[in-house]
């Protein structure tokens, strides 16, 4: 079964990154690199990407009496997508285990960042299981 694991955050959480020490940032990047490598080598990783900050996003609509392209994420959004993993695992429980490990990425002082990871089954995969 395929799942998407979505790391979300608020603007305040990501503004917080600017205050992290270089060592703390390097520790988090090293964790993510090792985590992704482990998923890839175990054969469960389909794809993973980190995303640019929301200020760089564009929202595109069909038009119809409005601007078809606007800056940023939806203004009413409190959270935004920071990155994702697509995994192919045998059970929802395995997807939850992997999501919990992703949430353990170190934050300042090496403490787990506890970032929320939303887990959703990919619909096309649901019909094949």
Q: What do these predicted ranges mean?
A:
Residues 1-129:
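Conserved, structured core segments of small domains
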């Amino acid at each position: 079964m395929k799942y998407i694991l979505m790391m979300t955050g608020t603007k305040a959480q990501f503004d917080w990154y600017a205050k992290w020490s270089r060592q703390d940032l390097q520790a988090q990047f090293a964790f993510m690199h090792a985590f992704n490598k482990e998923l890839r080598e175990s054969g469960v990783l389909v794809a993973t990407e980190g995303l640019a900050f929301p200020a760089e996003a564009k929202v595109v609509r069909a038009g119809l009496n409005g601007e078809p392209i606007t800056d940023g994420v939806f203004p009413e959004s409190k959270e935004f997508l920071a990155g994702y993993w697509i995994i192919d695992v045998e059970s929802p429980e395995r997807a939850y285990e992997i999501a919990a490990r992703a949430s353990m990425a170190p934050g300042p002082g090496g403490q787990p960042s506890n970032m929320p990871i939303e887990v959703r089954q990919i619909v096309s995969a649901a019909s094949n299981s």
